[in-house]
Amino acid sequence: MLDPILLRKDLQTVVDRLKSRGVDFDIARFNELESRRKAVQTETESQQARRNALAKQIGQLKGKGAPEAEVQAVMAESQALPARLKALEDELAQTQAQLNDLLMSVPNLPHASVPQGASSDENVEVRRWLPGAADERGNPAALGFEVRDHVAVGEPLGLDFDLAARLSGARFSFMRGQMARLHRALAQFMLDLQTGTHGYTECYTPYIVNSSTLFGTGQLPKFKDDMFFVTKGGGDDEPKVDEQGNPLAREDQYLISTSEITLTSVVRETIVAGADLPLRLTAHTPCFRSEAGSGGRDTRGMIRQHQFDKVEMVQIAHPEHSYEALEEMVGHAERVLQLLELPYRVMLLCTGDMGFGSAKTYDLEVWLPAQDTWREISSVSNCETFQARRMQARFRNAQNKPEYVHTLNGSGLAVGRALVAVLENCQQADGSVRVPAVLQPYMGGLTVLEP
């Protein structure tokens, strides 16, 4: 969520920066609600002051023995104030809720270093890394034989999309034998690298979260259609009640679309000691996405699935150091690809292609020879205070005052897409797949997968 104080002080700058993202902020609606909020707040404060003055006046009148009629007249006015104050407080709460609803639909402001642009066509390549020779375009040189895509390579090795479709429908995969082992090896290698070399703390998190958690990280309310909603079977739990014993509404639950949600929420509604920053957290989890807006893209294979595994990196950082942390996290994701000897490039996303909560994002794109193109395998973002403000995540600064942390997240990496990249880049002319050296210890020393 954006800082309401920034909106009040410098609305036009906010509007201009949002416009660079292709977002037209409803200035009229904001001004209407803000004017109403100010008016109601001013009237509330006036009535509160009047209440205090009347209480003092009643005491003075009684103290000097004023006529009863005079005392009663003042008391009558005083007794009418609570109802008026309650109505004003309700109106103020309603207006503030409407303001919050407006702000919750507004994306983060882009950092000054983010290039202007409307779509992915205007993203900027920062660098690329190739483990071998390049062709005339600067892309990895051809393999020297007819390249097959990961589906054709993987199916003889234990990748089964037909069985997955019978079990679950489209956009799922089933793996067995050496293929399942390779998938597991990738995840274990990534976790070991992030924890052992890069200093992240491994976490095991829930795969089901409540709506307030998703609200804090920004998935709700805007991306509700992208989530899998969970319906609980069996008997109900004992109903929760408030302090007065009234039943509370049951909170909706969803499958996580990324463990960014659970890892970032570790600091929800907490105040962290400044000396403890940065926090570096990682987890290997399945991720569940409805792909509601995919429009029939990537229906073949493992590129875009309803269920996929990912090793996530999250940093909770001091605001003064968060952009150093962003570059560090990009390097952590790059190192995975380098050790796997997979060609990749780093792209700085333009204003029109960034995610909802991001102030600055880098995408890592891996080379897929069968598609003759680069495909995203990691996205690393600095959300600054956008998530922290929604979830009330703070730290104590040098003055011992609470201040919002900066939250960062990134894939380190998407396991399924890494498997796709290994199958395509490490395939051999006879249909076998060379196991990258860094994965061989996780494969019991196996160097080649053979049909």
Curated annotation (Swiss-Prot):
A Pfam family: tRNA-synt_2b
Known EC number: 6.1.1.11
Gene Ontology biological process terms from the UniProt entry: selenocysteine biosynthetic process; seryl-tRNA aminoacylation
The protein's annotated pathway: Aminoacyl-tRNA biosynthesis; selenocysteinyl-tRNA(Sec) biosynthesis; L-seryl-tRNA(Sec) from L-serine and tRNA(Sec): step 1/1
Main location: cytoplasm
Cytoplasm recorded as keyword: yes
Binding sites annotated in the UniProt record for ATP: 289-291, 376-379
EC class (word): ligase
Compartments in which it is found: Cytoplasm
Keywords per UniProt: Aminoacyl-tRNA synthetase, ATP-binding, Cytoplasm, Ligase, Nucleotide-binding, Protein biosynthesis
Reaction catalysed by this enzyme: tRNA(Ser) + L-serine + ATP = L-seryl-tRNA(Ser) + AMP + diphosphate + H(+); tRNA(Sec) + L-serine + ATP = L-seryl-tRNA(Sec) + AMP + diphosphate + H(+)
MF GO annotations: ATP binding; serine-tRNA ligase activity
Matching Gene3D superfamilies: Bira Bifunctional Protein, Domain 2, Serine-tRNA synthetase, tRNA binding domain
Binding, L-serine: 258-260, 312, 411
Any one GO CC term of the record: cytoplasm
UniProt note: domains: Consists of two distinct domains, a catalytic core and a N-terminal extension that is involved in tRNA binding.
Function, as annotated: Catalyzes the attachment of serine to tRNA(Ser). Is also able to aminoacylate tRNA(Sec) with serine, to form the misacylated tRNA L-seryl-tRNA(Sec), which will be further converted into selenocysteinyl-tRNA(Sec).
Sequence similarity: Belongs to the class-II aminoacyl-tRNA synthetase family. Type-1 seryl-tRNA synthetase subfamily.
UniProt subunit comment: Homodimer. The tRNA molecule binds across the dimer.
Protein name as annotated: Serine--tRNA ligase
Taxonomic placement: Bacteria, Pseudomonadati, Pseudomonadota, Betaproteobacteria, Burkholderiales
